[in-house]
A protein has these predicted regions:
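NAD(P)H dinucleotide-binding glycine-rich loop of Rossmann-like/cofactor-binding domains
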Residues: 68-75, 80, 84-152
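N-terminal Rossmann-like NAD(P) cofactor-binding module of classical short-chain dehydrogenase/reductase
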Residues: 92, 149, 195, 217-218
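A generic alpha-to-beta junction signature in SAM-dependent methyltransferases
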Residues: 142, 210, 233-234
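Mid-domain Rossmann-like dinucleotide-binding core that forms the NAD(H)/NADP(H) cofactor-binding site
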Residues: 122-200
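Short glycine/proline-centered loop/turn elements that form peptide/ligand docking sites
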Residues: 79-84, 174-184, 198, 202, ...
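Short amphipathic alpha-helix with an adjacent loop that forms part of the alpha/beta core around
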Residues: 201-212
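Glycine-rich beta-strand-centered segment in the early N-terminal region that forms part
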Residues: 26-44, 52-97
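Glycine-rich phosphate-binding loop and adjacent beta-alpha segment
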Residues: 186, 224-251
Length: 251
């Protein structure tokens, strides 16, 4: 059987249990020119919250009673004369939150799991990594010597964005929650410093680590942290942010 997660209603604020329904259906058979894929991993991305809102955005919303959209990586276990993929190929693309799915291959790409672990293709080499790469380079337009602040620094996007900024010769300050995450951000990821928003005052931390102000802020969280970062900007510099999903600043 094929377990699938269906969208049952559009949430207001945070999704709740009745937003979804877990169902079991027969494993589908691939039609002519299709393949059957067994899902190994699903990419859980913040963008998924936006996909279940009503109304068109940069992408059509997930329809009610449809399988929840998600990036996946899996192995082809059956082919019906597919011109490009064969049984045993590992592919990544839009597979949805389900154990098996069929596809024509449109929007899917074969990956080489001998180069890096499979999960990297839905992490640093997938949507989170691409968000970080294009956000920090194309939107933030960082340059050597910039002071860059990254919120959500221990997360999938923030961790990659910060490392790219370090490679470009920037001074990089992270914001994360808790001493363990901050230690990881500095000691493992190579950030210059990290502000623990759970135990430190953000404004004081920014004054300590960015006394001359910020050049670029990569915002992953919004809210009060965004407010503090905006107050620390050098005049005329850049703030690039990901979308707010379920929470908003009160001022």
């Amino acid at each position: 059987m094929n377990k699938q997660l269906l969208l049952k209603k559009r949430p207001v604020g945070l999704p709740e249990e009745d937003t979804w329904a877990m169902v079991s259906n027969e494993i589908p058979e691939p039609k002519e020119g299709e393949v059957l894929v067994q899902t190994h991993y699903i990419s859980l991305d913040p963008a998924m919250r936006g996909w279940i809102n009503e109304g068109k955005s940069y992408i059509e919303p997930v329809a009610l009673d449809d399988v929840m959209r998600a990036g996946t990586i899996g192995t082809i276990i059956k082919s019906n004369n597919h011109p490009k993929f064969k049984v045993g190929d590992v592919i990544t693309g839009w597979g949805g939150v389900q154990q098996y799915f069929t596809t024509t291959g449109e929007g899917h790409f074969k990956v080489d799991t001998s180069l890096v672990p499979m999960t990297k293709y839905i992490g640093a080499l997938g949507m989170p990594g691409m968000t970080a790469y294009f956000g920090i380079l194309e939107v933030g337009k960082i340059k050597e010597g910039d002071v860059v602040l990254i919120s959500g620094a221990a997360g999938a996007v923030g961790s990659v964005a910060g490392q790219i900024a370090k490679l470009k010769g920037c001074r990089v300050i992270g914001i994360a929650g808790g001493p363990d995450k901050c230690a990881y951000v500095v000691n493992e990821l190579g950030f210059d410093a990290c502000i623990d928003y759970k135990n430190e005052n953000i404004y004081s931390g920014l004054k300590e680590h960015c006394p001359k102000g910020l050049d670029v802020y990569f915002d992953n969280v919004g809210g009060d942290i965004l407010d503090a970062a905006l107050a620390a900007f050098c005049e005329g510099r850049s703030c690039g942010r990901r979308k707010s999903f379920s929470m908003f600043s009160s001022g």
